[in-house]
Amino acid sequence: MKHSLHKIIERQDLSTEEIKEVFKHCFSQEVSDSELAAILISLKMKGETAEEVAGLSQVIQEHSPFLLNFHQPVMDNCGTGGDRSNSFNISTCSAFVLAGAGVTVAKHGNRSVSSQTGSADVLEKLGVSLAFTKEQVNEMLDKNQIAFLFAQHVHPTLKQVGKVRKDLRIPTIFNFIGPLTNPVHLDSQYIGVYDPEALQMVAKAAQLLGRERAIVIHGAGGLDEASLQGENKYILVENDRLEEKTIHPEEVGLSVYPNDEIQGGNATENANILLSVLKGEDSAYLDTVLFNAGIALFASKKADSIYDGVELARESITSGSALSKLNNLITFSKKVSEVV
């Protein structure tokens, strides 16, 4: 442990096993808050590696009581956060579009850390439970093609670091690992990163964690989602191959909008935006979701191209299928609360 800490301070990279050892001590409460803060800041100053991100992700997954291998291919779509854009909950809304298009989605998310409203905040406002059991998650995936896994609920170990993350108020290695720690085995994934320098690192980490196919994207204007503002950079991960690409909204029939057209607000405001999108109301919000869901459908192999993915996403919304997935999740949540 001391050797690994010394390496971090000296700005030397850790192996997967070394980083796992460090954070096993952190999660066992053998490290003070000030020491943990120093570790996180030192890692950030050094620059986190794919091996370190993958190793920490594995530690968190190994401690989760929600580890699940579903009988069908599963995907997740999630951004790292940290872009300070105050955009609405794009990936949360897109998740229902994916499910409506026939993709099984284990949506992993949290409350707000460095943004105004997190996925858990907006879903809770809509009436979705944040405390499903492992068996209930499996049932929802089976019957409704989408389940929500609240990070603080499915990862008890994160409670040990929550206060420090909140106090620091800056993106740390935990922002990178958030999308990678889903306790449900994922076959494919769509990940947004706020930092273009992190594209390769996060893509490699996803590869190390066994994703068969993934897209890691950095949006125009610094979004951790695909943006309608201009050209977006992404990496396609497919087995042992990493391929750098770009995508512009006009290439898939979507108009250009500045990022300030997709500003969000508090949980109530974002819930209303989400509902307006799933009801198909024309706006920059809708087109942003079509863009991101389209890319995710391509990542999942449900669509042969991003253009086809956008059209499939549009059909998911216009048919009412996407909205029905949300309504089913709310209904299931009510039944669960009545039993309790």
Curated annotation (Swiss-Prot):
GO molecular function terms noted in the UniProt entry: anthranilate phosphoribosyltransferase activity; magnesium ion binding
Cofactor remark: Binds 2 magnesium ions per monomer.
Residues involved in Mg(2+) 1 binding:
91, 225
Keyword list, A-Z: Amino-acid biosynthesis, Aromatic amino acid biosynthesis, Glycosyltransferase, Magnesium, Metal-binding, Transferase, Tryptophan biosynthesis
User: Where is it found, in Gene Ontology cellular component terms?
Assistant: cytosol
Pfam family membership, one? Glycos_transf_3
Which positions are annotated as binding Mg(2+) 2?
224-225
E.C. code: 2.4.2.18
Q: Supply one GO BP term.
A: L-tryptophan biosynthetic process
Q: Which residues form a coiled coil?
A: none
Q: Which cofactor does it need?
A: Mg(2+)
Q: Quick one: which residues bind 5-phospho-alpha-D-ribose 1-diphosphate?
A: 79, 82-83, 87, 89-92, 107-115, 119
- Write out the similarity annotation: Belongs to the anthranilate phosphoribosyltransferase family.
Share what the entry says about its subunit structure, partners included. Answer: Homodimer.
Describe the task this protein carries out. Catalyzes the transfer of the phosphoribosyl group of 5-phosphorylribose-1-pyrophosphate (PRPP) to anthranilate to yield N-(5'-phosphoribosyl)-anthranilate (PRA).
The protein, known as: Anthranilate phosphoribosyltransferase
